[in-house]
Amino acid sequence: MKNNFYQEDELLSNELSNRGFLLTKVDDVIGWARANSLWPMTFGLACCAVEMMQAAASRYDMDRFGMLFRPSPRQSDLMIVAGTLTNKMAPALRKVYDQMAEPKWVLSMGSCANGGGYYHFSYSVVRGCDRIVPVDVYVPGCPPTAEALIYGLMQLQKKIKRTTGFKYDARQTH
């Protein structure tokens, strides 16, 4: 059974080769472009960051999805929060998020980023990065595998493709 992304690409290439042109809506083109050109900025805080690096390496190759890691928040539109967020690090996370260009998305990776994880009852741990920044996709696990991260990124791509209009707020789409 083929993946939906590949089915869409196959339909697109068939329509282009048969007719020579393509009819679509501007919203669909913008959604396609945004979903297939995500530029993530890593916010690796703990062991989940190692799995994120593995997903970007040659075996899983996130580049094939159009994702290119950027070192600056001003150049990125996706923040991957990977690991335990402490109270001391929370203001830095918010500052980096505020510096990102619109539209922007956040992926929370791992039990610690999702809800505090193993350190949930520690006095110094934020019980989920969604208390600091709005989160679009949660990837569970301790640590989640590279496959789980790739799956979470594909879910984010689906979410982005479903949006309409030039102004985007992922938290209002269902």
From Swiss-Prot:
GO CC terms: plasma membrane; respiratory chain complex I
InterPro entries xref list: NADH_UbQ_OxRdtase-like_20kDa, NADH_UQ_OxRdtase_20Kd_su
UniProt keywords, alphabetically: 4Fe-4S, Cell inner membrane, Cell membrane, Iron, Iron-sulfur, Membrane, Metal-binding, NAD, Quinone, Translocase, Transport, Ubiquinone
Keyword Translocase found: yes
Binding site for [4Fe-4S] cluster: C47, C48, C112, C142
Main location: membrane
Entry EC no(s): 7.1.1.-
Subcellular location: Cell inner membrane
Family matches, as Pfam families: Oxidored_q6
Cofactor mode of binding and number, as noted: Binds 1 [4Fe-4S] cluster.
Needed cofactors: [4Fe-4S] cluster
UniProt GO BP: aerobic respiration; electron transport coupled proton transport
Entry function: NDH-1 shuttles electrons from NADH, via FMN and iron-sulfur (Fe-S) centers, to quinones in the respiratory chain. Couples the redox reaction to proton translocation (for every two electrons transferred, four hydrogen ions are translocated across the cytoplasmic membrane), and thus conserves the redox energy in a proton gradient.
Subunit field text: NDH-1 is composed of 14 different subunits. Subunits NuoB, C, D, E, F, and G constitute the peripheral sector of the complex.
Family affiliation: Belongs to the complex I 20 kDa subunit family.
Descriptive protein name: NADH-quinone oxidoreductase subunit B
Lineage: Bacteria, Pseudomonadati, Pseudomonadota, Alphaproteobacteria, Rickettsiales
Gene that this polypeptide is encoded by: nuoB
